[in-house]
A protein has these predicted regions:
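Peripheral, non-AAA+ core regions of ATP-driven protein-machinery
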Residues: 1-218, 225, 331, 471-472, ...
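Short loop/turn elements that form and flank the Walker-type P-loop nucleotide-binding site
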Residues: 26, 58-61, 98-99, 131, ...
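Residues immediately C-terminal
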Residues: 110, 303-304, 310-311, 397
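P-loop NTPase nucleotide-binding/switch module
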Residues: 170-209, 213, 240-295
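Walker A/P-loop
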Residues: 219-260, 325
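Basic, amphipathic alpha-helical bundle interface domains used for macromolecular binding and assembly
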Residues: 39-44, 59, 66-76, 289-290, ...
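Walker B catalytic acidic pair
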Residues: 300, 306-307, 318
């Protein structure tokens, strides 16, 4: 008997329906075709054991299984469940008429229990688009899939539950998630707050500007000056996720298997902080069977690179194109996939190998050549992509005393959100543009025109600091954000002066 069950394959962050055709006839052979990988071919043994433990027998017939379309590679063990159900239906131990209503995914253990799988959210979205009545998934994945409206999601623990449900001998209750209620309830819960940081008001101001305009940022300073502490509090002043942003980001983390068990939607912007030994592929994504990298996992959030010069130079250079395009294309012989990469880059570094160049109290042990060599580990074009460059200094005791109060993240976030609201209104007619950092050259000429005094100041700065055309654009974008923070429709000289101050690596002559 020929029957069909349905699953899906994930490519990039979208899914494609996989039709599993099972034909059971007289004979004793087992064939699995349709470009399955090793893990899929090994499902034969898992299915036999799972069915036996659950009280069912694997059919002693000639079984031919085709996973269509055949040009898409099927990877992983997530097809175990639809394969097993299809085999039972083809052997006439199940009513095959109900299989067409449901999509199924799940890895089988030898005892018949189901293990969670990756990529459930994009698969659930595809199941709804294709008109399936329900989606049967491991219980741990149910809440993640249930955020998709107009689709009944059934979380199950064993294959026996699925068999009895398809046979009509068991009722399963769909998993229900109040997406909006859960999303908004946990949106503003942060472990770290800017009130924890004493002093460093100029750096906090720079972080506020970066958050308001989604500008890339680098902090340069000696060890122990608070660079990492400040950077890790940046998510607490970013505007909260919109529901659409949360769905986009959750899809990426779902594909990468980074969603926590029994989790529905991500409620806070991601903060990714990879180690400096990371490889090119782990950073931008790829591999023989492409997976999203750190830049995509940081989509709609922050990618924090601590000790920037310690990263392999090739790793830093491959980030330049995604920083500009806000997407990354991974091409392989059989397919090409696109991953979103709209992240805010935040980096930190010491000013020299020993960390104490220009320190007021501790002597630097590095030669001028060593300092220059250290700084040159980060290329000029990459630094041009970093809008705000700030020197973090060691603070005296008076400034870090716990007796001094410090502004909390909530107060800063309110100002940031007001500036972002101005930008959203400004760019409402421009699809894909939401912040000042995303402005094109055309939009710069329209919305970031300084007054006469500001233009004169900028001309002098360009000449004295020998700034590139790219740095010129960055200064204008940051100036536009500074004006938005003051709700000023015009960019004035004071805004440009502050923006120029945030080009520390252009203003300083390191190692001389």
């Amino acid at each position: 008997m020929l029957v069909k069950s349905y699953a899906a394959a994930v490519q990039g962050i979208s899914a494609t329906v996989i039709t599993i055709e099972v034909n059971c006839t007289k004979g004793i052979q087992f064939f699995l075709v349709g470009l399955p990988d090793v893990a899929v071919r090994e499902s034969h043994e898992r299915i036999i054991s799972a069915l036996q433990v659950s009280g069912y027998k694997f059919p002693r017939n000639r079984i031919v299984i085709n996973m269509a379309p055949a040009d898409i590679r099927k990877e992983g063990s997530s097809y175990d469940l639809p394969l097993a159900i299809g085999i039972l239906a083809a052997a006439e131990e199940l009513d095959a008429s109900r299989l067409g209503h449901y999509m199924m995914m799940g890895e089988l253990s030898l005892d018949g229990s189901l293990k969670p799988v990756k990529g459930i959210l994009p698969i659930a979205i595809k199941a709804r688009e294709e008109g399936f009545k329900g989606f049967i998934v491991p219980k741990q994945n149910a809440r993640e899939a249930a955020v998709v409206n107009d689709l009944d999601v059934y979380g199950v623990s064993t294959i026996k539950e699925v068999i009895e449900f398809i046979a009509g001998r068991r009722d399963l209750e769909p998993t229900v998630v109040n997406t909006r209620e859960e999303f908004y309830a946990r949106q503003l819960q942060f472990e770290a707050d800017f009130s924890d940081v004493r002093g460093q008001e100029n750096v906090k101001r720079a972080l506020e500007v970066a958050a308001a305009g989604s500008h890339n940022l680098i902090l340069i300073g000696p060890p122990g000056s608070g660079k990492s502490m400040l950077a890790k509090r940046l998510p607490s002043i970013l505007p909260p996720f919109t529901l659409q942003e949360s769905l986009e980001t959750t899809k990426i983390h779902s594909v990468a298997g980074k969603i926590g068990l029994d989790t529905s939607l991500m409620t806070q912007r991601p903060f990714r902080s990879p180690h400096h030994t990371i490889s090119n592929v782990a950073m931008v994504g790829g591999g023989a069977f492409p997976q999203p990298g750190e830049i995509s996992l940081a989509h709609n959030g922050i990618l924090f690179l601590d000790e920037l010069p310690e990263f392999n130079r090739s790793v830093l250079e491959v980030m330049r194109q995604p920083l500009e395009d806000r997407t990354i294309t991974v091409s392989r012989a059989r397919l090409s996939v696109d991953y979103p990469a709209n992240f805010m880059l935040v980096a930190s570094m010491n000013p020299c190998p020993c960390g104490y160049y220009n320190h007021p109290d501790r002597p630097c042990l590095c030669s001028p050549g060593a300092v220059q060599k250290y700084m040159n580990r980060v290329s000029g074009p990459l630094l041009d992509c970093i809008y705000i460059q700030v020197v973090v200094v060691q603070l005296p005791f008076e400034n870090i005393s716990y007796g001094r109060s410090s502004e909390c993240s909530e107060a800063i976030r309110e100002r940031v959100m007001k500036a972002r609201a101005i930008q959203e209104k400004r760019f409402a007619a421009h699809e894909g543009i939401y912040s000042n950092a995303q402005m094109t050259s055309k939009l710069l000429h329209e919305y970031a025109v300084p007054d006469a005094a500001g233009l004169s100041l900028l001309k002098v700065a360009m000449q004295r600091l020998n700034l590139s055309a790219r740095a010129y654009d960055r200064i204008l974008k940051v100036s536009r954000t500074l004006a938005d923070l003051e709700a000023s429709p015009n960019i004035e000289a004071c805004h440009l002066a502050e923006a120029i101050q945030y080009r520390s690596l252009d203003r300083e002559t390191w190692g001389t």
